[in-house]
Amino acid sequence: MKMFSMLALFVIAADQFTKKLAVFFLRDMQQSITIIPDFFSFTYAENRGVAFGMEFAPPFVLLMLTGAIVLGVLVFVARSRNRTPIFLSAFGLIAGGGIGNMIDRIASGRVTDFIYFDLYKGELFGHWVSLWPIFNVADSAITIGACMLVLFYNRIFPDTEETRHAG
């Protein structure tokens, strides 16, 4: 459990620290910082929705949904007997990222985003599109944790003799 807690706290701290830097250097100084021209930059954005800026519910509902998911992850990890590093890492990343974004929603009603990969900007099926959203450290942690759950599913949730005969 210590690994889970430490990783979640690290993600929260890194997320909040980098968002403070983004507010100061990108929003307050009104600039975008190009790292790799036409590919990677730090660009300030505020997101009232969820992934990819989708706004499917009022801010209060999104806050409650985020809280319920984080609480669900915390309860699941606490009740599970699985203490493997990969299990704790995946769920620690997801919980830390969820809490990091939840802090923003509580403080300002929106999430600060600033990491931007310009993979494609142009016309697609007659509409102007930008194919990659601006995101943050918390979003990255959630995505990495979710990918770990998919990629290492059999190691995280081993198929034991008991579970095979339980159904």
Swiss-Prot record:
It holds the Pfam family Peptidase_A8. InterPro entries: Peptidase_A8. It catalyses: Release of signal peptides from bacterial membrane prolipoproteins. Hydrolyzes -Xaa-Yaa-Zaa-|-(S,diacylglyceryl)Cys-, in which Xaa is hydrophobic (preferably Leu), and Yaa (Ala or Ser) and Zaa (Gly or Ala) have small, neutral side chains. It comes from the Bacteria. Its EC number is 3.4.23.36. The keyword Cell inner membrane applies. It is a multi-pass membrane protein. Keywords: Aspartyl protease, Cell inner membrane, Cell membrane, Hydrolase, Membrane, Protease, Transmembrane, Transmembrane helix. One of its GO terms (molecular function) is aspartic-type endopeptidase activity. One of its GO terms (biological process) is proteolysis. Pathway: Protein modification; lipoprotein biosynthesis (signal peptide cleavage). The active site is at 113, 139. The chain crosses the membrane at residues 56-76, 84-104, 132-152. Its main location: membrane. It is found in: Cell inner membrane. Belongs to the peptidase A8 family. This protein specifically catalyzes the removal of signal peptides from prolipoproteins. This is Lipoprotein signal peptidase.
